[in-house]
């Protein structure tokens, strides 16, 4: 059943088609601010007027958001620009890739300038599909003028029309040929006119008696081109360019794909005549060419309602919602969206960034548009104007389907559109997604449906593809006993009832080939649903999703997570006296970030892991030797919290598969060697915007003892709660770049959680951490614990007190479970039933393990984690 969270998630994550943008600057020109002022990302002003841009709401908002993009400690413009310079020099393509994340296709008007920019097809590397072209007709005309001027002398007397007749015929013939060639070019999907800038939108209808007037206009234009840069800015000629393009598009539509004409309307610099930028002037032209589709660009601001009227009453008119994001304030953006929807069908609205020169123009526009769309659509649903399903359909149409249909792109949104547990309105059904996956992976014969229980055990049900398809089509259901809530790793049920069941619903966004193992299978994560199909709060993935959505819905905070996998590779050994099998380090001449002789022997395995993960779209950020014997670290890319944990689980499985092929065992056991560093699973968590970082952190610290029940979820985990081993030490505190604090601050709104290891159910661990932060923001808690630059355990009590450090970390699972049991706020947020069941399971697990001797307990855990 779709919920408001489903709608919000769709708006924030659905792939988009950017139907109007421009080329990016090359890296060598990306910081030439004297030539390309960076302030123009939020203003159309030029010259002296641009100096006033820093006083606008849009500027302040953009500066704050860009600070989070660059992880700048300050939103001061000079600091932001300095951070940008570093980002451009360090990894320009990485910055672009981040800014274009979520973009399926770019439609580029690549004739804005020929200088300092990358070619249109260079942009393909950053999007899911190939870039397409929008051809600017005034640029074509200027190129023809240039050819004529350089091909021979231009008559001096512009009043002698007979002298220009031949040149006019050549111009009109060559211009028409260029337009016709572009119509036939499959890389071109549309045309654009900037007549709004040149002579205004009041394009005059065709009148054969005006031939003399047209040639006079041409004569003036080419005479000017002979002495300066060719530019068409004479009304009769500009009007003719538009009409001739429309005539050619009309004639070609019988045999060629549909190629609309985009027109700049409204918002622009002081080159435009504001009155003549009103799209109402186009009404007679639109009526004259019903066979050609018109796209009114840039929300026609400030004439959005006039454009909306045209898009409502003429079936060949579409309203583009671009450029005002991020050029105008938040309130104005929401108002423009509301005006656009007053009478315009949602199927006639298109999205574009008008991104140009700077990749950040794309990032800001997409981010602000998604936020405004979410705010407006949620309001409409809450007021009863839309159902949730209608709003989801409209959002998907605006972001993707309308442009896909209008420009005949034949794009399919990737399965990532069905992400993180939200039903989305894609034109592709779940069945189609499965069929597409099978076509792309014909060797897959089985699907492993997976879920993670409270012991962090991955439970698996395997289905032949045809049977799995029945689940996807809802022709059958996959029921699981409720006893799973209270089940230990060895299937002992320690509480609750064996009566009743819940159902696993596949999340097809996680469907992925099972790689690194000799198996014709794929894996998919699942959601837990009730008999009635409702989400269960006991489901760890749902719980994390709900907490993340509360942050977003109530405070506009977007959380992002990324994980470091620390893992020890062990080799099997046999005690010759007893025949008992055990494990020993795979390498011993080994230390942090070194490449020893033994480490080099591991390179084929390490590189196989990296390449195998990349083959399924998981691209490691780095990997290296860690401190303990046989210990390595693999750093995963960041994502939304649920997707990040999904990636973590999948990556661990791939690593285990490959290591087993090499005759080794990969273990997440927290402290395999008492004399060496332990094994963690540190998480990076960031919130955006970072303006609430202090209250968020205050909430985390206030509830941290209870959070540890989820992040350090086994007795063995507390062998790492010690000072001096870079594991977070022993006190509830935080510190900037302090690896002896349980929470290391890295940049504004970005922390590393040190008190976390591979025994944790990571969905629950992240849910608990975010829930604690949520309480701080909701209660506006002050941050009373100061930034600690030391190992708090090494400080005398008076110095700890001066820093506000008063609470020790629980040093046993029993203590952290007791803290959770007494934390009513956290229990309520995570769900009383979930917390109660979790505590039952963890106490029973602790009792079972404590009955074993140390060697047996270690072996038992290494075999399972």
From Swiss-Prot:
Under the heading PANTHER family, the entry gives:
AMIDOHYDROLASE 2 FAMILY PROTEIN (PTHR43383:SF2), NODULIN 6 (PTHR43383)
Question: What would changing residue 774 to N do, according to UniProt?
Answer: Temperature-sensitive
Domain of life of the native organism: Eukaryota
Family as reported in the entry's similarity comment: Belongs to the glutamine synthetase family.
Pfam families attached here? Amidohydro_2, Gln-synt_C
**Where does the GS catalytic domain lie?**
540-865
Any Gene Ontology biological process: regulation of secondary metabolite biosynthetic process
PROSITE patterns from the UniProt entry: GS_BETA_GRASP (PS51986), GS_CATALYTIC (PS51987)
Q: Which residue ranges does the record assign to the GS beta-grasp domain?
A: 442-533
Its taxonomic placement starts with: Eukaryota, Fungi, Dikarya, Ascomycota, Pezizomycotina
Q: Where in the cell is it found?
A: Cytoplasm
Q: Name one GO molecular function term.
A: hydrolase activity
Among its keywords, does the record have Cytoplasm? yes
Functional description taken from the UniProt entry? May function as a GSI-related enzyme in synthesizing a small diffusible factor that acts as an extracellular signal directing asexual sporulation and perhaps other aspects of colony growth. May be involved in brlA activation (an early transcriptional regulator for conidiation specific gene).
Where is it found, in Gene Ontology cellular component terms?
A: cytoplasm
- State the UniProt keywords alphabetically: Conidiation, Cytoplasm, Sporulation
This protein's name: Protein fluG
């Amino acid at each position: 059943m779709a919920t408001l969270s489903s709608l919000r998630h769709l708006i924030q994550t659905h792939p988009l088609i950017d139907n109007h943008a421009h080329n990016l600057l090359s890296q060598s020109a990306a910081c030439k601010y004297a030539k390309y002022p960076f302030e123009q990302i939020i203003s159309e002003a030029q010259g002296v007027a641009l100096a006033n841009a820093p006083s606008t709401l849009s500027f302040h908002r953009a500066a704050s958001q860009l600070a989070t993009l660059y992880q700048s400690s300050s939103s001061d413009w000079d600091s932001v620009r300095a951070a940008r310079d570093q980002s451009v020099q360090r990894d320009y393509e990485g910055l672009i890739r981040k800014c274009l994340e979520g973009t399926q296709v770019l439609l580029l008007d690549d004739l804005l300038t020929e200088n300092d920019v990358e070619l249109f097809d260079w942009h393909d590397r950053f999007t899911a599909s190939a870039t397409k072209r929008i051809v600017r007709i005034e640029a074509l005309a200027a190129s023809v003028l240039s050819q004529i001027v350089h091909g021979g002398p231009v008559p001096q007397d512009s009043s002698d029309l007979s002298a220009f007749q031949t040149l006019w015929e050549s111009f009109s013939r060559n211009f028409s040929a260029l337009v016709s060639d572009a119509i036939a070019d499959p890389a071109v999907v549309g045309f654009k006119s900037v007549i709004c800038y040149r002579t205004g939108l009041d394009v005059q209808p065709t009148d054969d008696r005006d031939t003399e007037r047209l040639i006079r206009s041409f004569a003036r234009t080419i005479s000017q081109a002979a002495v300066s840069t060719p530019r068409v800015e004479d009304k009769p000629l500009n009007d003719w360019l538009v009409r001739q393009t429309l005539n050619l598009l009309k004639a070609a539509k019988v045999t060629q794909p549909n190629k609309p004409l985009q027109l700049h309307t409204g918002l622009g610099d002081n080159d435009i005549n504001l009155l003549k930028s009103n799209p109402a002037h186009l009404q007679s032209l639109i009526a004259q060419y019903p066979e050609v589709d018109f796209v009114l660009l840039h929300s026609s601001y400030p004439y959005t309602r006039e454009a909306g009227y045209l898009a409502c009453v003429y079936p060949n008119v579409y309203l583009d919602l671009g450029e005002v994001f991020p050029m105008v304030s938040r309130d104005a953006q929401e108002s423009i969206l509301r005006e656009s929807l007053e009478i315009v069908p949602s199927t006639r609205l298109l999205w574009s960034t008008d991104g140009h020169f700077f990749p950040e123009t794309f990032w800001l526009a997409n981010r602000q548009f998604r936020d405004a769309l979410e705010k407006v659509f949620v309001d409409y649903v809450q007021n009863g104007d839309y159902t949730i399903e209608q709003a989801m359909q409209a959002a998907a149409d605006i972001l993707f389907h309308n442009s896909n249909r209008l420009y005949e792109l034949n794009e399919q949104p990737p399965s990532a559109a069905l992400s993180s547990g939200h039903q989305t309105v894609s034109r592709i059904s779940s069945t189609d997604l499965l069929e597409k996956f099978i076509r792309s992976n014909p060797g897959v014969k089985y699907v492993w449906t997976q879920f993670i229980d409270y012991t962090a055990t991955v439970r698996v049900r395997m289905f032949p593809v045809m049977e799995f398809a029945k689940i996807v089509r809802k022709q059958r259901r996959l029921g699981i006993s409720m006893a799973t809530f209270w089940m230990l790793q060895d299937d002992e049920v320690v509480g609750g009832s064996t009566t009743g069941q819940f159902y696993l619903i596949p999340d097809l966004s996680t469907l992925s080939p099972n790689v690194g193992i000799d198996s014709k299978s794929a894996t998919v994560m699942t959601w837990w649903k009730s008999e009635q199909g409702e989400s269960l709060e006991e489901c760890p993935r749902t719980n994390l999703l709900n907490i993340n959505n509360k942050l977003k819905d109530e405070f506009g905070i977007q959380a992002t997570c990324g994980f470091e996998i620390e893992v020890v590779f062990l080799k099997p050994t046999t005690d010759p006296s007893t025949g008992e099998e055990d494990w020993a380090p795979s390498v011993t001449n080994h230390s942090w970030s070194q490449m020893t002789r033994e480490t080099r022997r591991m390179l084929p395995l390490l590189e196989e892991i990296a390449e195998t993960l990349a083959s399924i779209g998981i691209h490691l950020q780095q990997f290296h030797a860690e401190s303990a014997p046989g210990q390595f670290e693999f750093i995963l890319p960041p994502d939304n919290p649920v997707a990040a944990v999904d990636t973590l689980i999948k990556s661990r499985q791939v690593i285990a598969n490959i290591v087993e092929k090499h005759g080794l065992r990969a273990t997440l056991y927290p402290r395999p060697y008492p004399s060496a560093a332990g094994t963690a699973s540190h998480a990076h968590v960031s919130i955006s915007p970072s303006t609430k970082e202090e209250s968020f952190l205050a909430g985390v610290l206030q509830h941290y003892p209870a959070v540890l029940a989820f992040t350090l979820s086994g007795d063995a985990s507390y062998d790492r709660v010690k000072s001096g081993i870079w594991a977070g030490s022993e006190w509830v505190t935080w510190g900037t770049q302090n690896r002896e604090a349980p929470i290391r601050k890295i940049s504004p709104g970005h922390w590393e959680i040190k008190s976390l290891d591979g025994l944790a159910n990571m969905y629950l661990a992240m849910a608990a951490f975010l829930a604690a932060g949520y309480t701080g923001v909701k209660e506006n808690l002050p941050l009373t614990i100061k930034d600690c630059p030391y190992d708090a355990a090494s400080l005398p009590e008076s110095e700890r007190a001066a820093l506000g450090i008063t609470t020790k970390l629980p040093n046993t699972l029993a203590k952290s479970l007791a803290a959770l049991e007494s934390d009513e706020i956290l229990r309520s947020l995570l769900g009383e039933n979930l917390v109660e069941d979790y505590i039952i399971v963890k106490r029973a697990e602790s009792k079972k393990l404590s009955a074993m001797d140390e060697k047996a307990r270690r072996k038992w855990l290494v075999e399972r984690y």
